[in-house]
Amino acid sequence: MSRSKRDNNFYSVEIADSTFTVLKRYQNLKPIGSGAQGIVCAAYDAILERNVAIKKLSRPFQNQTHAKRAYRELVLMKCVNHKNIIGLLNVFTPQKSLEEFQDVYIVMELMDANLCQVIQMELDHERMSYLLYQMLCGIKHLHSAGIIHRDLKPSNIVVKSDCTLKILDFGLARTAGTSFMMTPYVVTRYYRAPEVILGMGYKENVDLWSVGCIMGEMVCLKILFPGRDYIDQWNKVIEQLGTPCPEFMKKLQPTVRTYVENRPKYAGYSFEKLFPDVLFPADSEHNKLKASQARDLLSKMLVIDASKRISVDEALQHPYINVWYDPSEAEAPPPKIPDKQLDEREHTIEEWKELIYKEVMDLEERTKNGVIRGQPSPLGAAVINGSQHPVSSPSVNDMSSMSTDPTLASD
């Protein structure tokens, strides 16, 4: 594309102290969220004739960590296609060459609210169970591609008014290790598993801890472990769940183990005390969903020792969840990710910049006619339509009572 022709395809608008330079097809931009990764706007896509969300990545080439995360997000969004993972509609840059390249814009489906807003609604069992089921389906799909999230939280899970849920991002790269230190929070880490905050090894069920924290928040209407830093968070975990057994301590690094073993010992509380019946909605007559089932699921997810924690497959088969089970959702074919060493890659900022530029150019070429070509199904088209679920009451899959603005929050 020639320089003058490319210039004519874009226009600029000031959004939340940032300049958005976007394709002319995107109109009526309105800010709806911001965070560590960038600013998000709602917009109308005149080609697709639908509302979308546009995220401008925040300083993607500021350092190697930012650049690696931007590359990882682009590659994974291009490959992953599941109804419970946010759909990629377009990627573009207003710059005309690699030398000028500095801005990346990602266009995604626009949702109605994030889970932070939904949690405050005092959900009934059907809604809570259905939201958790979709969360688990999305997580299982990521796991099938070798993607372990490690950073699930309500702000990065979004819903439609019909109760459709989607996971927004792909979490922490595996090489982004965290040490057990009194590091100030840059993003919310209340939902990260003990093995992450203690700098241990981990496996797929690291994400089930996060789901347990989110479910607990749905029940209690408050954050379970709101630590000021990792040490304070660990203290809050053991105060409620109890000090782990000596076998767990043996798995810790020596310096971490010394600290953990020197903490006061706590017996913890029973899950009946942590989550009493009074906190739960009335038992569901339609699907026979009960507080006792929900509490049992919580007790299997909120387990400090990951070797004793439930897996995503086991969670999907739990009585509180499996009323929704549909193989087309829970057993969808795994995405094919061409770069098998995605999380292990290490490059200079300039090398990352070139890799990201190539991805953006490839995606621009594939979206010339409005939508991404080469996807298993047209992302963004009929994204809400799923299989029939075993519930007929419109109140179960209808959250139209939500009085929230459209959102697609970043962390």
Curated annotation (Swiss-Prot):
The modification Phosphothreonine is found at T183. Residues 26-321 form the Protein kinase domain. SUPFAM superfamilies: Protein kinase-like (PK-like). SMART domains: S_TKc (SM00220). Its EC number is 2.7.11.24. Belongs to the protein kinase superfamily. CMGC Ser/Thr protein kinase family. MAP kinase subfamily. Pfam families: Pkinase. Activated by threonine and tyrosine phosphorylation by either of two dual specificity kinases, MAP2K4 and MAP2K7. Inhibited by dual specificity phosphatases, such as DUSP1. Inhibited by SERPINB3. Inhibited by IFN-gamma-induced S-nitrosylation. It is an enzyme of class 2 (transferase). Residues 390-403 have a biased composition (Low complexity). Its cofactor is Mg(2+). The lineage of its organism: Eukaryota, Metazoa, Chordata, Craniata, Vertebrata. This is Mitogen-activated protein kinase 8. The TXY motif contains the threonine and tyrosine residues whose phosphorylation activates the MAP kinases. The gene is Mapk8. Residues 368-411 are annotated as: Disordered. The modification Phosphoserine is found at S377. InterPro entries: Kinase-like_dom_sf, MAP_kinase, MAP_kinase_CS, MAPK_JNK, Prot_kinase_dom, Ser/Thr_kinase_AS. One of its GO terms (biological process) is positive regulation of cell migration. Dually phosphorylated on Thr-183 and Tyr-185 by MAP2K7 and MAP2K4, which activates the enzyme. Phosphorylated by TAOK2. Phosphorylated form is more concentrated at synapses than none-phosphorylated. It comes from Rattus norvegicus (Rat). Coiled coil: none annotated. It catalyses: L-seryl-[protein] + ATP = O-phospho-L-seryl-[protein] + ADP + H(+); L-threonyl-[protein] + ATP = O-phospho-L-threonyl-[protein] + ADP + H(+). The active site is at D151. ATP binds at I32, G33, S34, G35, A36, Q37, G38, I39, V40, K55. Forms a complex with MAPK8IP1 and ARHGEF28. Found in a complex with SH3RF1, RAC1, MAP3K11/MLK3, MAP2K7/MKK7 and MAPK8IP1/JIP1. Found in a complex with SH3RF1, RAC2, MAP3K7/TAK1, MAP2K7/MKK7, MAPK8IP1/JIP1 and MAPK9/JNK2. Binds to at least four scaffolding proteins, MAPK8IP1/JIP-1, MAPK8IP2/JIP-2, MAPK8IP3/JIP-3/JSAP1 and SPAG9/MAPK8IP4/JIP-4. These proteins also bind other components of the JNK signaling pathway. Interacts with TP53, WWOX. Interacts with JAMP. Interacts with NFATC4. Interacts (phosphorylated form) with NFE2; the interaction phosphorylates NFE2 in undifferentiated cells.
